[in-house]
Amino acid sequence: MKKLFIILLIGFLNINLFAQDFPFPPELKWWIFEIQSIDKNVKIENFKFSEKRSILNQDAPISYKNRLYPVLKKWNYFGNEFAYYDIYASLEKNKSGKYSISGEPDTAFGIFDKNEILLFVDFFGSSKGIDSFCWVRDNRIIAVGRDIINSYEDGLSDIDFIIYDYYIKNGGEIIVKEYTYNIKSVNMAKLKLRWVEQRSDYFENN
């Protein structure tokens, strides 16, 4: 009986080790709703833990003073740091008065101090990136994005939808946990997952 109890306890601990432990902000629920337009079964609790990694502080300070766009910044509550959608992104104003956003095939999510000094950067390849993000505490960010696993000639793709949990530790390190939900044969043209696609009042999307 005691042995059975220990086995059950270990199993319970293993299950909870990979359970979600992140606070998903209501500001990002639109992203879940967008995915539900192609898969009604998707829920936050369906995302499974897939990876834990760390990002170290930049070895040398890099200033981006006067090179960043305010609309791409989100400040933490204390106001001493901000996260930046993509440090490679640029904005162009169109004749309509709205903006188009462009950048490199690869993207980079950055965290800066109030003087626009780059503290941390998370690099993504051309198939992977962040759609939107939100501070939930002064030292914690929840971000959402996707990774294109396979692309097919008919225009469909197998996608890992990803929730990122960024925890900024004292001592110059960020712990990143990733939670994924896979959907096969997705027509990405039917989805508006990037936050700029939700702001038709400000942006024009190609």
Residue ranges and their predicted role:
Residues Y85-G103, D147-I163:
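Short, conserved, GDST-rich strand-edge loop motifs in beta-rich repeat architectures
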Residues D21, D147-N206:
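Acidic, small-residue rich beta-repeat scaffolds with periodic aromatic anchors
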Residues A19-K95:
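Terminal domain-start segments
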Residues Y99-N115, D158-G171:
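Beta-propeller blade signature
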Residues K73-F82, F133-N139, E204:
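Blade-terminus and WD-like Trp-Asp/Gly-His loop motifs, strongest in beta-propeller folds
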Residues Y69-V71, P105, G129-D131:
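Beta-rich catalytic cores
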Residues I55-N66, N115-K128, I175-T180:
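Multi-bladed beta-propeller domains
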Residues L4-I15:
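Sec-dependent N-terminal signal peptides
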